[in-house]
Curated annotation (Swiss-Prot):
Organism of provenance: Manihot esculenta (Cassava)
Upper lineage: Eukaryota, Viridiplantae, Streptophyta, Embryophyta, Tracheophyta
Domain of life: Eukaryota
Enzyme class, first EC level, given as a word: transferase
Function recorded in the entry: Responsible for the synthesis of amylose in reserve starch.
Presequence extent in this chain: 1-78
Manganese is among the record's keywords: no
GO MF term set: alpha-1,4-glucan glucosyltransferase (UDP-glucose donor) activity
Catalytic activity: an NDP-alpha-D-glucose + [(1->4)-alpha-D-glucosyl](n) = [(1->4)-alpha-D-glucosyl](n+1) + a ribonucleoside 5'-diphosphate + H(+)
Official protein name in the record: Granule-bound starch synthase 1, chloroplastic/amyloplastic
Coiled coil (residue ranges): none
Keywords: Amyloplast, Chloroplast, Glycosyltransferase, Plastid, Starch biosynthesis, Transferase, Transit peptide
Associated pathway: Glycan biosynthesis; starch biosynthesis
One BP annotation, GO: starch biosynthetic process
Length: 608
């Protein structure tokens, strides 16, 4: 049992110092404090006329604080388990560009189902319809300015979903969360991303202390300070640094611990070394950030590396599959120059689960015929015909159909797949590709219909219904990733009895067993600036091998093996619990097996 004291509704004690990182970005270099107005729609930048009203409100708040007329302290008794705070730049379905958003969408409810108290903290990029203003704000000192952030909250599937409201998040990607989280377009970052994600880290350290949340029947009041933070990817790498540099020296979060999870080591947060003083960290942290590489971006030579610091300053380092954990310490190529540091700290890999509520062939709202393992062989030919008709291919249930769903970029190997199609269509086969990404790749797949009108189709759109139709209607799902920390497409495919054909990398090795639940083609080259002919040959050879099993008893057995697996978050949640208990945060207790509280009401959430 844990006892905490719930106190206030507005925090004014968090004047955490951090220098402005981009003095000219986004008009942040105004004279004097930069203020915001608080509206039902969140924080917006103030015009000059609004500032008088803001001063009046500020005086009123100070008067209430001085007279002690705020909400009185209350003794709150909480349930058992752990207090877990997941922090990330994305959380599905509210904001998602890939696996990071899926993990923060799916793992926290699974941990809550085991009896733990769970919060996620992420930016409020949009006016999420089911996230409500808590009326709690904190003031964070950034350089010589005081920035106000406000917290919005939604309680879903046993998880406190907390969103950090600030103009740097809300005004940047208004209405287009999915495509503009990190930059105005693919491959281009915002110039003030260091400032944005520093603010996220500081706000995440405040949220467990100041938010008085009472949505759960088992928990109420603030989370307190005996918590385990789970920081995700480079955007949250400053969290353990600020914890050690600012909070713990003041006696705050004395027993808190941080687990740092790497979702994709290719994205590290490398910036000019001259930016380090702007992070407002003591010089003793400089060595954790110090990094030299051979690239000229963002500057040539010495840099700071956020992910390196997150790895070195956290209490535990994890990633999203056991095989990927082996890969990132195998050498410079797959460890992307951080392999030496990870070998020193150690790393554990826990495979991801998947959302078995959204992706369920028994209840899927996007397919006309529902099925399970007992009816799959009758249902899939009909679903294939529906898919063929939808994309304009000749309707023939006897033609093997291969699907591809994913981002059109080098990591996912979409360019290698397209290069192999001219050889693949020599077989009796149809191919359907769905994805968005780099414009040159989108044009490539859209041109497939012209080149192979009876054999291939490419759809360069974000199309959720079609993704479900491909997953259900295809016979095989191709996942030719150059590297893949975990991967979700192969999990979705197996859940629907669609046999995956995968590159032998990362989580694809852990989840797809050769000859039992799919086909392995071997590891592809990780260089993204060219297509290796050996990789094209590997795809062609492995696809031919898979097609050789079509309409055989061997393929039927594979289909049933795929569908017999438990691909939910239950198993991964047990492993995460064990790892987090090993952090030995005061008051932590094991959880119990349980079911998720309720499905996520996605109709109340704007489409990411």
């Amino acid at each position: 049992m844990a006892t905490v004291i719930a106190a206030h509704f507005v925090s004014r004690s968090s004047h955490l110092s951090i220098h402005a990182l981009e003095t000219k970005a986004n008009n942040l270099s105004h004279t004097g404090p930069w203020t915001q107005t608080i509206t039902p729609n969140g924080l917006r930048s103030l015009n000059t006329m609004d500032k008088l009203q803001m001063k009046t409100q500020s005086k009123a708040v100070k008067k209430v604080s001085a007279t002690g007329n705020g909400r009185p302290a209350a003794k709150i008794i909480c349930g058992h388990g752990m207090n877990l705070i997941f922090v990330g730049a994305e959380v599905g379905p509210w904001s998602k560009t890939g696996g990071l958003g899926d993990v923060l969408g799916g793992l926290p409810p699974a941990m809550a189902a085991r009896g733990h108290r769970v919060m996620t903290v992420s930016p409020r990029y949009d006016q999420y319809k089911d996230a409500w203003d808590t009326s709690v704000s904190v003031e964070i000192k950034i350089g010589d300015r005081i920035e106000t952030v406000r917290f919005f909250h939604s309680y879903k599937r046993g998880v406190d979903r907390v969103f950090v409201d600030h103009p740097m998040f809300l005004e940047k990607v208004w209405g287009k969360t999915g495509s503009k989280i990190y930059g105005p377009r693919a491959g281009l970052d915002y110039q003030d991303n260091q400032l944005r994600f520093s603010l996220l880290c500081l706000a995440a350290l405040e949220a467990p202390r100041v938010l008085n949340l009472n949505s759960s029947k088992n928990f109420s009041g603030p989370y307190g300070e005996e918590v385990a933070f789970i920081a995700n990817d480079w955007h949250t790498a400053l969290l353990p640094c600020y914890l050690k540099a600012i909070y713990q020296p003041m006696g705050i979060y004395k027993h808190a611990k941080v687990a740092f999870c790497i979702h994709n080591i290719a994205y590290q947060g490398r910036f000019a070394f001259s930016d380090f003083p702007r992070l407002n960290l003591p010089d003793k942290f400089k060595s954790s950030f110090d990094f030299i590489d051979g690239y000229e971006k963002p500057v040539k030579g010495r840099k700071i590396n956020w992910m390196k610091a997150g790895i070195l300053e956290s209490d535990r380092v994890l990633t999203v599959s056991p095989y990927y954990a082996q890969e990132v310490i195998s050498g410079v190529e797959r460890g992307v120059e951080l392999d030496n540091f990870i070998r020193k700290t150690g790393i554990a890999g826990i495979i991801n689960g998947m959302d078995v509520q959204e992706w369920n062939p028994v209840t899927d709202k996007y397919i006309d015929i529902h099925y399970d393992a007992t009816t799959v062989m009758d249902a899939k030919p009909l679903l294939k015909e529906a898919l063929q008709a939808e994309v304009g291919l000749p309707v023939d249930r006897n033609v093997p159909l291969i699907g591809f769903i994913g981002r059109l970029e080098e990591q996912k190997g979409s360019d290698i797949f397209v290069a192999a199609i001219s050889q693949l269509v020599e077989h009796n086969v149809q191919i359907v590709i769905l994805g968005t990404g780099k414009k040159k790749f989108e044009k490539q797949i859209e041109h497939l219909e012209v080149l192979y009108p009876d054999k291939a189709r490419g759809v360069a759109k974000f199309n959720v219904p079609l993704a479900h139709m491909i997953t259900a209607g295809a016979d095989f799902m191709l996942v030719p990733s150059r590297f893949e920390p975990c991967g979700l497409i192969q999990l979705h495919a197996m859940r629907y009895g669609t046999v995956p054909i995968v590159a032998s990398t990362g989580g694809l090795v852990d989840t797809v067993k050769e000859g039992y639940t799919g086909f392995q083609m071997g590891a592809l080259h990780v260089e993204c600036d060219k297509i290796d002919s050996a990789d094209v040959a590997a795809i062609v050879k492995t696809v031919a091998r898979a097609l050789g099993t079509y309409a055989t008893a061997a393929l039927r057995e594979m289909i049933l093996n795929c569908m017999a697996q438990d691909l939910s978050w239950k198993g991964p949640a047990r492993m995460w619990e064990k790892m987090l208990l090993d952090l030995e945060v005061t008051g932590s207790e094991p959880g119990t097996e349980g079911e998720e509280i309720a499905p996520l009401a996605k109709e109340n959430v704007p489409t990411p």
